Design a protein with these regions (language model features):
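Active-site-proximal helix/loop segments of hydrolytic enzymes
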Residues: 1-142
Length: 142
């Protein structure tokens, strides 16, 4: 069942969780040679006002904690997978803007790259990704 962007944030906000991690796979059909992993955290932009997260959307502490979480997970992913490091980036994605706890969005590879897609569809690489995400989260909390 598809869960809408605002509903994802609402569920995260109501869950009592300490962090929010949104897992995705990227695509760039115009350039099938692009590969790598990138991690996003929220960047305030007044052109994107909050819808459900008015109190925390521009909270400096939440944004700093999100940046720390993004760095910890990105570092672990690159170290454990050997993937191209496309960096920690900032964006106004709805799930980052509307979530009231430290939040990151992971792009774990490019499905438009035949080479990367072949890796992404194997159970062993999926396990490697899951373990790397877990290690990054553990490092964030230490």
């Amino acid at each position: 069942t598809y869960v809408g962007l605002l509903e994802r944030s609402k569920e995260a906000n109501a869950s009592g969780a300490d962090i929010f991690v949104s897992i995705h796979h990227n695509a760039m059909p115009a350039n099938a040679t692009v590969t790598g992993i990138e991690t996003y955290y929220y960047e305030y932009d007044s052109d994107y006002p909050p819808i459900i997260n008015e109190d925390m959307h521009n909270d400096p502490t939440r944004i700093l904690e999100s940046a720390d979480l993004a760095s910890a997970i990105q570092g672990s992913l690159v170290e454990n997978t050997g993937a191209i490091d496309r960096g920690v980036r900032r964006n106004t994605f709805a799930v980052l803007r509307e979530t009231a706890i430290p939040a990151v969005l992971l792009e774990l590879g490019y499905m438009s790259s035949p080479t990367e897609l072949a890796k992404l569809t194997t159970a062993s690489y999926q396990t490697t990704l899951a373990k790397a995400i877990t290690a990054g989260i553990v490092a964030y909390f230490e």
